[in-house]
Amino acid sequence: MASFLLSTLVFFLAALILVPQGLAQYHLNPVYEAPVNGPPVNKPPQKETPVQKPPQKEPPVHKSPRNEPPRHKPPHKKSHLHVTKRSYGKHATEEHSIHF
């Protein structure tokens, strides 16, 4: 009998601890509660302090030597196929005509 009363008492205390407001507001309609927090405050963004990191040395990269382009344009050489402009005007004379 004592164990039954003790277990009932423990069960009742556990119910009160685990569900403190469930039994009290079971039949009540939900009531709107205003938020506890105030309106948001505009704060300037916090600047993070820079973290000093040791410099990392990268291994040297092997680059093949390159020939630099000439700085000055070389003089133009006339090829043996170069054809000079004719000395006559728009129309060729009979001497320069190749038609037979």
Curated annotation (Swiss-Prot):
Residue ranges of Sequence repeats: 39-43, 44-48, 49-53, 54-58, 59-63, 64-68, 69-73, 74-78
GO biological process, one term: nodulation
Record's keyword annotation contains Transit peptide: no
Signal sequence residues: 1-24
Record-level GO cellular component terms: extracellular region
Domain of life of the source: Eukaryota
Basic and acidic residues: compositionally biased ranges: 55-71, 91-100
Annotated segments matching region Disordered: 32-100
Designated name of the protein: Early nodulin-12
Source organism: Vicia sativa (Spring vetch)
